[in-house]
């Protein structure tokens, strides 16, 4: 096995000795005068919200009214039923097999959310969608109207 990189010193032993002499000149083995680097501090990302489908803003840039509206929307989304995808015993049932938002097949055990129109989506996909537009991506039925009417009948 050869080394394709040319070096002025072709002898591995001489490279090893050079490395040891470099360390000795830097005072290895003694306490360095430098402090160790500060620990890595992970910055918490600022959430990005979509007050309307065409706008994207950081949470810190929203007005109080927009923050209230987003909090209400999140509250409504949390009231939508969620579950786990189960295609059935034989898997041949006429069930939806693909999330139309991400175009990925559902896999047994995937977290899903049910909309009042009976369409299902991956939980993360539909939650993100509903933060932008409160309509079903398949049939365009308003989700909030169906949610509010279901509260009135109970």
From Swiss-Prot:
Record remark: domains: The PPxY motif mediates interaction with NEDD4.
Residue numbers covered by motif PPxY motif: 37-40
Post-translational modification Phosphothreonine, affected residues: 135
CDD domains (UniProt xref): RING-H2_RNF11
Name the UniProt record assigns to this protein: RING finger protein 11
Recorded consequence of changing residue 16 to A: Loss of GGA1-binding
Documented effect of changing residue 15 to A: Loss of GGA1-binding
Coiled coil: none
Mutation effect (residue 127 to L): No effect on UBE2N-binding. No gain of UBE2L3-binding
Main location: other
Compartments, as annotated in UniProt: Early endosome; Recycling endosome; Cytoplasm; Nucleus
Tissue expression summary: Expressed at low levels in the lung, liver, kidney, pancreas, spleen, prostate, thymus, ovary, small intestine, colon, and peripheral blood lymphocytes, and, at intermediate levels, in the testis, heart, brain and placenta. Highest expression in the skeletal muscle. In the brain, expressed at different levels in several regions: high levels in the amygdala, moderate in the hippocampus and thalamus, low in the caudate and extremely low levels in the corpus callosum (at protein level).
Annotated stretches, region: Disordered: 1-53
Biased amino acid composition, Low complexity: 41-51
UniProt-listed PROSITE patterns: ZF_RING_2
One of the record's GO molecular function terms: DNA binding
